[in-house]
Amino acid sequence: MHRASLICRLASPSRINSIRSASSYGNNTISATPLVQQRKQSVAASVKHEPFLNGSSSVYIEQMYETWLENPSSVHTSWDAYFRNVEAGAGPGQAFQAPPSVAYAGSMGVPSAPITSAAPATRLDTNASVQSISDHLKIQLLIRSYQTRGHNIADLDPLGINSADLDDTIPPELELSFYGLGERDLDREFLLPPTTFISEKKSLTLREILQRLKEIYCTSTGVEYMHLNNLEQQDWIRRRFEAPRVTELSHDQKKVLFKRLIRSTKFEEFLAKKWPSEKRFGLEGCEVLIPAIKQVIDSSSTLGVDSFVIGMPHRGRLNVLANVCRQPLATILSQFSTLEPADEGSGDVKYHLGVCIERLNRQSQKNVKIAVVANPSHLEAVDPVVMGKVRAEAFYAGDEKCDRTMAILLHGDAAFAGQGVVLETFNLDDLPSYTTHGAIHIVVNNQIGFTTDPRSSRSSPYCTDVGRVVGCPIFHVNVDDPEAVMHVCNVAADWRKTFKKDVIVDLVCYRRHGHNELDEPMFTQPLMYQRIKQTKTALEKYQEKILNEGVANEQYVKEELTKYGAILEDAYENAQKVTYVRNRDWLDSPWDDFFKKRDPLKLPSTGIEQENIEHIIGKFGSYPEGFNLHRGLERTLKGRQQMLKDNSLDWACGEALAFGSLLKEGIHVRLSGQDVERGTFSHRHHVLHDQKVDQKIYNPLNDLADPQGEYTVCNSSLSEYAVLGFELGYSMVDPNSLVIWEAQFGDFSNTAQCIIDQFVSSGQSKWIRQSGLVMLLPHGYEGMGPEHSSARPERFLQMCNEDDEIDLDKIAFGGTFEAQQLHDTNWIVANCTTPANIYHLLRRQVTMPFRKPAVVFSPKSLLRHPMARSPVEDFQSGSNFQRIIPETGAPSQNPPNVQRLVFCTGKVYYDMVAARKHVGKENDVALVRVEQLSPFPYDLVQQECRKYQGAEIIWAQEEHKNMGAWSFVQPRINSLLSIDGRATKYAGRLPSSSPATGNKYTHMQEQKEMMSKVFGVPKSKLEGFKA
């Protein structure tokens, strides 16, 4: 890393001139962009001969030269001589001819050589000049080594057992002998380079330099920042750690810290005493987390942030709820009692619960809102949810740069290094439609994962190395130095405010108990836990410190301990009086105003006026004058206008009418996912690109009216897990919005299965949290193989909370039955087959008096299918979503003669229409589409069954028998038919382990086999049939 053979070859005159021209630009004000350009030009010409130009010394030399240009006497005489030689025309190697070299064992020898006659007027003694430059470079390299590698030998482990970076060796570049320096040089004075702020003086002795570097970089704080590519950011961090006395706290600040440590520590001790056999995932061993979070909030509030969204795992959660959010202690303690819930929902364990509280921040004297997002035990899954929530809050507040809204994410060391969603979430950091302009990450680094040693749980030196990918500064800090923790938290808050980038605070700590309080850690970590038993708490150590410093006396300490003990006991007594638990006390995203004056069983019409339809399609089919549109898209847009005239609108028009009508009503619409701007199947084209002007775009749906709701359509990163989580978090903030995530193919949605299972399907039941998120999952068997055919509808249907048996004696169809079903369901599962129905479904998501997630199996081939069209009247006022679409052809005119009543869902309907015609069964077989699978339309299915009393009931599907909707619909249809002694039969593919065949021939044979079963005809009658 530090090779003088690369670094000590100083710049050529051409390089010096490039620096001079850059430094003189704009009245001697350094301009970063011209400087970078000049560097590139200089390097391009001489990089082969000047390898140091890619090294760290180039920046150092430039800084020295710029300083010399302003004032030659401000640099050491050796540099003054060198620059004068170069200015006089000395070429590379002529200003001095003997660059020193660094050897691991030894010396920086400098061979004597006469300087050339390039600048006789300014020639100094050769050996003295070269030796002096060599000394300065040694010091610069030494300081840089501590800045770069000092964290590797920092005293970070409060137990004194491990090295936080899993390596107990000392980097050789941190040894004086690496630079040919030794004891004899300790009292020599050296000029400090401009890349350090360790002293207000221009020079220090080597002894003082080493002392300061070790104090800054090798004690209880390890600072990782030299991987940052921005010199301004590096200097910013240096100033906040290297400047003398910068980390000191006042007596008042120390007292605040002490009181916060009391609350954090005594809260856990109190719970352990009252409920010794309860799991609570306490914070013992990292009690400083509470003061750390509070310091981040205090500093950020002072800097203008008024809304904080916290995502965290289970460890320490109760403590955060009690001492950061200030949720009433009695409410928290009542969770330890066995009490009946007072309201709906299944609830969740106490260490998963969320909360949203507004209160006065005493340090900033400003009101702040703090939300802790409820989450499952699936570690790190909450990260993107928090980021989406922050982004949405900032959007609705008009806080474009997130100056007032911020995420604080807490992590465990093993999960932070091990869970892929962490990197997926980091990757959203700087994406225009996803950035939250910086989050503060706090890692509770227990140095263990459940029972797994860090050496078995990660391949990187630190658990935080994932943050280096996106340029995070990383501050490692020993929790036994609470004051260092406070300083780091202040810097983190200031960094986020200044640069709008993520920052990581790594609290190196330990876990005093096992993974939970009932776990025995000595089984697997005996030596660590022997040491832990001998280790005092951070509170005890800090108490001794402030007493020794005279910050507080024994009486003050005793009073503070007694005061908080009394608060806990009082809360405990109040908790004993609680007779029930209210799940609503734990809402992380309350919508109180939304539910007021709304009839939960009234579903408004979703149709719109004719003139509105014409206006939206008119805009959707046009583009501005002077915009250079692709010729192919010109035809597409003209086609949209023609569809309106022909009274036959396609899928893209149905989507556009849903979005456009909501936008005109002031509703915010957000569509996110891979390739959604164009659409995976090139049907949407909501963002038009000028063919001649780069980055010039036009979004017709954002140009409908003034004012209107904002339409955000954004291509996402190639991630399902993080992006779906992000959109879920976004949907939680404001119910008056339509938030949609579209998978590239429905098959890929299972990459986000954790979000689907733990948040979307069960979120309302566990956390009383509603969401109107829509998931569009392209689905359909078209011979494209096992990974491009199925969105796995069976899985989504299996997670529906609806009973598969219905008591016809107790259920009254009609009236509010449909609304009641929607109110009670955990989510809506639909497979729409017409543009009008997808339009109504999307609008219904916003017009309903409550919010439910919707899983929609969207089409692929139907996007352009000539039969998959809807007339304009199907969108007009008075029209609504059709839960089923009954047969309207010849069979419906003569029901007694119908031999088979076939229920189906999705694209297969159009395949069966073609097959029915092919085999001549147009009068004998009625085809009914179930558009909404869940809640199941019992009432409408019953009507169809009674209409065709003599018909055989068939369920037909293109999916295999062990997939698709069959296992879901069979018991439901049969519960309706049982009273008549009838039952439904299956027609479709046989069971399979793979969703679909990858062979086109096999696919066609399966299609024909299925159709022969549906229509009861020999397979031979389907020769020549193509679906």
Swiss-Prot record:
Binding-site residues for Mg(2+), renumbered to this chain: D413, N446, I448
Keyword Metal-binding tagged: yes
Any single Gene Ontology cellular-component annotation: mitochondrion
Cofactor: thiamine diphosphate; Mg(2+)
Matches recorded under SMART domains: Transket_pyr (SM00861)
Known catalytic reactions: N(6)-[(R)-lipoyl]-L-lysyl-[protein] + 2-oxoglutarate + H(+) = N(6)-[(R)-S(8)-succinyldihydrolipoyl]-L-lysyl-[protein] + CO2
GO annotation terms (biological process): generation of precursor metabolites and energy; glycolytic process; protein folding; tricarboxylic acid cycle
Pfam families hit by this protein: 2-oxogl_dehyd_N, E1_dh, OxoGdeHyase_C, Transket_pyr
EC id: 1.2.4.2
Protein name per UniProt: 2-oxoglutarate dehydrogenase, mitochondrial
Organism of derivation: Caenorhabditis briggsae
